[in-house]
């Protein structure tokens, strides 16, 4: 019986890197709402008392970057200077310029179906049947913990919580099946007047126990709640934040490979984002069709070229048909050219700010989580 442990982490919406991601995607959404064909690459840097928004944008839209930034920070919960960051008093610097015409000529085409990829690169998508949302369990429950932290902070259940938080969950497996949770780490920013014992009890009873399935917890499960003992200084005052620095949190928690490209602040012509979403869509439909228990898709592109330079499938020995058959099915049922996948998933619209915290995958509100191709895939696989 093969035993192993696997760990994934997540961070809350108030983590500095996630503040940056949410601002970048708020800008993207505001532009796409006015101009669905806009080209946007928006990067954000946050530190004590300041936000710098930069990047390259080609659009007919006008958006108020300063107001968008303040609104986003306010909604996250940084509204007092004693937190080291205040939506209403922080400086907002705008350093956005225009996209290079050299990139435009490689992407734009008279026939939109032949739209070239906005850059070269490789992207991965993954799905696993170990949870009902066809996501790996470690990242799923790591997200659930910090999402719960945000809920009980915002609704006043635990009023001493502050926006910055991190979680980490270690699952125990036997023969690749979950047998329990080995360790849980949850660190949450808090007001200075809460006693450590009260914090630990509140986090355990209000966040951890309602979120993690009791059958996976046992007497040997280890809990680390604010293990340094104090977490008052957090958010951008504790660490600077940058767009695109939480790419494993954003995806599969390390359970699948990653091509290296970040998502937030990028319009759908950037295959770093759109093709990673399409690859998840493909992998999830293959698993939903029962063609594999686990599936990882890789696609790659050349700048200015519409057709992917490669498509590959890995099922880790769980495939019910050969990987050659799966690749043929993928090519038959999914258009993975940049324009095709944007149309297939209806990506040219303002849906991205919601992706920028608590993971881009495993959330039913997003179109790449649909399993509408599963039945046709299963039929054509002739299982």
From Swiss-Prot:
Residues that, per the record, bind L-methionine: 56, 99, 239, 270
GO terms classed as biological process: one-carbon metabolic process; S-adenosylmethionine biosynthetic process
InterPro entries membership: ADOMET_SYNTHASE_CS (IPR022631), S-AdoMet_synt_C (IPR022630), S-AdoMet_synt_central (IPR022629), S-AdoMet_synt_N (IPR022628), S-AdoMet_synthetase (IPR002133), S-AdoMet_synthetase_sfam (IPR022636)
Positions annotated to bind ATP: 15, 164-166, 230-231, 239, 245-246, 262, 266
EC assignment: 2.5.1.6
Bound cofactor: record note: Binds 2 divalent ions per subunit.
Single Gene Ontology MF annotation: methionine adenosyltransferase activity
Cell compartments where the protein resides: Cytoplasm
Keyword ATP-binding: yes
Ligand binding (Mg(2+)): 17
Cofactor: Mg(2+); K(+)
The reaction(s) this protein catalyses: L-methionine + ATP + H2O = S-adenosyl-L-methionine + phosphate + diphosphate
Keyword Isomerase attached: no
Annotated stretches, region: Flexible loop: 99-109
GO terms under cellular component: cytosol
Pfam families, per database record: S-AdoMet_synt_C, S-AdoMet_synt_M, S-AdoMet_synt_N
Main location: cytoplasm
UniProt-listed NCBIfam families: metK (TIGR01034)
Function recorded in the entry: Catalyzes the formation of S-adenosylmethionine (AdoMet) from methionine and ATP. The overall synthetic reaction is composed of two sequential steps, AdoMet formation and the subsequent tripolyphosphate hydrolysis which occurs prior to release of AdoMet from the enzyme.
Family stated for the protein in its record: Belongs to the AdoMet synthase family.
Protein name: S-adenosylmethionine synthase
Protein source organism: Shewanella oneidensis (strain ATCC 700550 / JCM 31522 / CIP 106686 / LMG 19005 / NCIMB 14063 / MR-1)
Lineage: Bacteria, Pseudomonadati, Pseudomonadota, Gammaproteobacteria, Alteromonadales
Gene: metK
């Amino acid at each position: 019986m093969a035993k192993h442990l696997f760990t994934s982490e997540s961070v809350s919406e108030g983590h500095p890197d996630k503040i940056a991601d949410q601002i970048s995607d708020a800008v993207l959404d505001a532009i796409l709402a006015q101009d669905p064909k806009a080209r946007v690459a928006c990067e954000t840097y946050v530190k004590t008392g300041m936000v710098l928004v930069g990047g390259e944008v080609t659009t007919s839209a006008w958006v108020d970057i300063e107001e968008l930034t303040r609104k986003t920070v306010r909604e996250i919960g940084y509204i007092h200077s004693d937190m080291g960051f205040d939506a209403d008093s922080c400086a907002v610097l705008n350093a956005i310029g225009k996209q290079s015409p050299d990139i435009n000529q490689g992407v734009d085409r008279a026939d939109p179906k032949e739209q070239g990829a906005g850059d070269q690169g490789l992207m991965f998508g993954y799905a696993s049947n170990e949870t009902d949302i066809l996501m790996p369990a470690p990242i799923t429950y790591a997200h659930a913990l910090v999402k719960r932290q945000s809920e009980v902070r915002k609704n006043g259940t635990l009023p001493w919580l502050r926006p910055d938080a991190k979680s980490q969950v270690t699952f125990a497996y036997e023969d690749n099946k979950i047998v329990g949770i080995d360790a849980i780490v949850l660190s949450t920013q808090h007001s200075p007047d809460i006693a450590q014992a009260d914090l630990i009890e509140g986090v355990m009873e209000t966040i951890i126990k309602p979120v993690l399935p009791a059958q996976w917890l046992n007497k040997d499960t280890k809990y680390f709640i604010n293990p340094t003992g104090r977490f008052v200084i957090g958010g951008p005052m504790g660490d600077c934040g940058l767009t695109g620095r939480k790419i494993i949190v954003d995806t599969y928690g390390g359970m699948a490979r990653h091509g290296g490209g970040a998502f937030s602040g990028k319009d759908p012509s950037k295959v770093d984002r759109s093709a990673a979403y399409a690859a998840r869509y493909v992998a999830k439909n293959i698993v939903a069709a029962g063609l594999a228990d686990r599936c990882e898709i890789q696609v790659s592109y050349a700048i200015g070229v519409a057709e992917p330079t490669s498509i590959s499938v890995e099922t880790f020995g769980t495939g019910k048909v050969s990987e050659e058959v799966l690749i043929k099915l993928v090519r038959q049922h999914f258009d993975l050219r940049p324009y095709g996948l944007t149309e297939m998933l209806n990506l040219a619209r303002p849906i991205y700010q919601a992706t920028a915290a608590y993971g881009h995958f495993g959330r039913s509100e997003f179109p790449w989580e649909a399993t509408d191709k599963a039945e046709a895939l299963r039929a054509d696989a002739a299982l």
